[in-house]
């Protein structure tokens, strides 16, 4: 049997005080092959569970004596050993990775009993790869909607709604870099290529003070490290896309790289099948991920991460003399360089320089009319984070962050024959900064507290010009210009964060948290998902920062030696300065965009249940959310509260994975949710506009009659998906391995509405909602390989 880990024990020094033995400081460093640091490794010391930090490091203070220690991590073999602690000790543990495609599905979850952090969950790619997905394309953002408290906008939507928040209120990060548009194909898929991703973590409440800038959640996606010892590759070929990844050492044992690419071939297949009809029309998207790291020495590491991806949609119609062309290109570019330093066993820091950009370009021609539009957002960021652990009773974290924003709110031009209209919407600029400090304190053996304070600052500056608004909020028709660096509107807010953990007997605990968050950037959209025509706008004199406050309390219980995990969380959240648009608002090429906005408040509350089986041939979980979310705007619904469009009273997810035998594994997912709320007319009536003076005949128009906003519910959404994973040679020691994944999406062919439109019967003067459906039953097959 090969060794699953190697362990080196080094006794550094001992202290004695009088006749009494002093507690010993025990430092544990967990690594993989090539000295790769394993973050989030689970360490059990006499059944007390801890986790390593981002550098694979853990320090605890233990009374002298004999201890049984178990170390485990996702995709690595676990390691158990006993050790006598009679002095300060350093433990270096190297875990051996698992290589097979099959294996028990395990959720890497921080919702355990002993962790002070609540409302946090994470999933690894090994699990997501086995679950059934639409068209065989793995999508981490869709997978996390199977967890309680996280919803999508409906069939095929990637807009995420966490505990009553909007799609722009989630801080989506790739290796710590913000992503402003995480969607492909108008929201059908996300930009995260499963071949390049290691895990995804979601924080729904009790947000730590080192995160900010969004109201609702943090969605932290981590890409994979490369292999420092040997060259390896992996990939997959599916129905609509293929992906390939290559990794290996740059300097063996010290430096590695990982390069991954994905592209759809919807356009290529369509041209082969129907070339005469398709012509140059088509759509595709691609992603490229790159990551490299370099261990300068045991205490210093450099990390570089990069992503670029675009969607390209083309349409042309020249039949019957028509000249119609439509070409839209949109995408993200991200890059970051990070320096990680372990100054001592107690002090470490990470400093990063980050660049990110989202851009949209559209060129359209309709006969003699041409239209061009471009928008985007570009950031340059620098940040530093520090962590100090004094002993087992106290841990401090602090840091600083600065971001320079450049907004391109939608410049363009319209040409009609010889006439041309050029939109002169100026770019906007802003400075955003924040500092934070947080401390973890063990008050008593049973009571732990995490208290933090984040202080955020935002300043919209010139050069730009803006419309002047009167006291009534309406435009005066005048503009005001600002010089470079001149302040237009500045805001600063304290954001306190505090959470408690109280341990109960028999592997149970109670947790509570309070969080205040501020958001200075807003997504200008009248749609539910983040479509590429949406515009990011900064807070200013008229647009105030959005603020949210959330309280949460939960009960957590582990059973049968941590094989089962149960939890229940209740939350209540208020939101101020929420944005909606007036009916019929024009977003594109609008110099008075702020004048189209109205401002209000929101409230969300609910309770989430989660039950999980983590080990054995059968694994899985059940998640259920009972919730309510409302919005209140003085200028909408007569000032009365109304149901938020994506309110979902009941939301249920059942996920199961069963190992049939050594070669076959089965997974199934069932989801059920209350239908989205929407506004439909109750009837239709004629309205007399007066007389036509030319022939003295009355002029009538027809008007739809509405009772209230979002007083209608779409039918309940429910669906069953299944998938099978087949590995021909699961225990093969050969370098090359492969597996097949077969899936069926929407097994019983449920007709879930994608949207509802209004059909008008002009003769009977009636209106009726017509449902449009998107996905019927869809089979898929994907071949995965690695070498």
In which residue ranges do the predicted regions lie?
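Short, acidic, small-residue-rich periplasmic hinge/interaction motif at the N-terminus
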Residues: 31-36, 42, 72-76, 86-134, ...
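Flexible loop and strand-edge segments within Gram-negative outer membrane beta-barrel domains
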Residues: 281, 299-381, 421-428, 531-532
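A beta-strand signature from Gram-negative outer-membrane beta-barrel systems
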Residues: 93, 146-147, 191-230, 234, ...
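Gram-negative outer-membrane beta-barrel transporters
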Residues: 571-574, 593-680
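Surface-exposed extracellular loop regions of Gram-negative outer-membrane beta-barrel proteins
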Residues: 359, 406-417, 421, 459-477, ...
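Periplasmic N-terminal accessory/gating domains of Gram-negative outer-membrane beta-barrel systems
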Residues: 108, 113-168, 173-207, 224-225
């Amino acid at each position: 049997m090969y060794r699953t880990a190697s362990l080196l024990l080094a006794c550094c020094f001992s202290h004695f005080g009088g006749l009494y033995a002093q507690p010993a400081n025990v430092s544990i460093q967990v690594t993989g092959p090539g000295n790769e640091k394993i973050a989030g490794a689970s360490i059990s010391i006499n059944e007390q569970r801890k986790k390593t930090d981002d550098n694979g490091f853990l320090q605890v203070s233990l009374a002298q004596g004999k201890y049984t220690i178990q170390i485990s991590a996702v995709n690595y073999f676990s390691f158990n050993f006993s050790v006598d602690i009679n002095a300060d000790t350093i433990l270096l543990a190297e875990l051996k990775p698992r290589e097979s495609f099959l294996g028990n599905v395990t959720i890497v979850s921080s919702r355990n009993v002993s962790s002070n952090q609540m409302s946090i969950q994470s999933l690894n790619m090994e699990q997501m790869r086995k679950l059934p997905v639409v068209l065989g394309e793995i999508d981490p953002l869709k997978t996390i909607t199977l967890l309680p408290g996280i919803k999508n906008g409906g069939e095929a939507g990637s807009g995420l709604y966490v505990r009553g928040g909007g799609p722009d209120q989630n801080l989506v990060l790739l290796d710590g870099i913000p992503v402003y548009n995480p969607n492909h194909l108008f929201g059908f898929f996300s930009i995260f290529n499963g071949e390049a991703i290691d895990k995804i973590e979601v924080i729904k409440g009790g947000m730590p003070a080192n995160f900010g800038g969004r109201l609702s959640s943090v969605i932290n996606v981590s890409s994979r490290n490369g292999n420092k010892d040997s060259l390896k590759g992996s990939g997959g070929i599916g129905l609509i896309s293929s992906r390939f990844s290559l990794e290996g050492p740059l300097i063996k044992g010290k430096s590695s790289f990982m390069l991954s690419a994905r592209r759809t071939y919807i356009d290529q297949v369509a041209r082969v099948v129907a070339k005469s009809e398709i012509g140059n029309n088509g759509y595709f998207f691609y992603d490229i991920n790159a990551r490299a790291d370099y261990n300068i020495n045991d205490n210093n590491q450099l990390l570089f991460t990069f992503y670029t991806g675009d969607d390209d949609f083309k349409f042309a119609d020249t039949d019957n003399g028509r000249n119609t062309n439509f070409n839209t290109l949109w995408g993200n570019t991200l890059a970051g360089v990070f320096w990680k330093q372990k100054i001592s066993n107690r002090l470490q820091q990470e400093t990063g320089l980050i660049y990110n950009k989202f851009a949209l370009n559209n060129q359209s021609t309709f006969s003699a009319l041409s239209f061009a539009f471009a928008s985007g957002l570009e950031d340059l960021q620098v940040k530093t984070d520090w962590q100090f652990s004094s002993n087992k009773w106290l841990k401090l974290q602090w840091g600083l962050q600065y971001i320079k924003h450049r907004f391109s709110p939608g410049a363009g031009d319209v040409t009609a024959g010889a006439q041309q209209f050029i939109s002169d919407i100026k770019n906007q600029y802003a400075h955003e900064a924040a500092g934070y400090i947080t401390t973890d304190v063990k008050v008593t053996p049973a009571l732990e507290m995490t208290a933090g304070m984040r202080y955020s600052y935002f300043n919209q500056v010139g050069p730009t010009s803006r419309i002047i608004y009167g006291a009534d909020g309406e435009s005066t028709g005048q503009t005001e210009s600002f010089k470079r660096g001149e302040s237009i509107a500045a805001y600063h807010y304290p954001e306190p964060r505090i959470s408690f953990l109280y341990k109960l007997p028999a592997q149970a605990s109670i947790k509570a948290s309070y969080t205040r968050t501020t958001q200075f950037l807003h997504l200008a959209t009248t749609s539910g998902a983040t479509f590429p025509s949406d515009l990011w706008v900064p807070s200013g004199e008229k647009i105030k920062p959005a603020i949210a406050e959330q309280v949460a309390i939960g009960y957590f219980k582990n059973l049968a030696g941590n094989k089962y995990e149960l939890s229940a969380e209740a939350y209540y959240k208020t939101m101020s300065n929420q944005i909606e648009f007036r009916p019929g608002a024009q977003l594109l090429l609008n110099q008075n965009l702020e004048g189209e906005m109205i401002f209000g408040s929101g409230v969300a509350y609910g309770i989430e249940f989660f039950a999980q089986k983590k080990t054995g041939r059968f694994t899985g979980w059940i998640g259920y959310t009972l919730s309510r979310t409302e919005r209140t705007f003085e200028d909408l619904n007569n000032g009365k509260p109304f149901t938020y469009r994506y309110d979902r009273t009941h939301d249920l997810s059942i996920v199961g994975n069963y190992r049939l035998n050594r070669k076959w594994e089965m997974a199934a997912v069932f989801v059920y949710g209350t239908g989205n709320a929407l506004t439909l007319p109750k009837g239709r009536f004629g309205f007399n506009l007066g007389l036509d003076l030319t022939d003295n005949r009355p002029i009538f128009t027809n008007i739809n009659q509405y009772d209230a906003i979002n007083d209608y519910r779409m039918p309940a959404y429910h669906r069953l998906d299944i998938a099978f994973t087949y590995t021909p040679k699961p225990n093969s020691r050969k370098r090359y391995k492969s597996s097949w994944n077969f899936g069926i999406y929407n097994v019983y062919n449920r007709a879930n509405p994608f949207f509802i439109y209004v059909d008008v019967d002009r003769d009977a003067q009636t209106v009726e909602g017509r449902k449009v459906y998107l996905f019927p039953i869809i089979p898929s097959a994907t071949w995965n390989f690695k070498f």
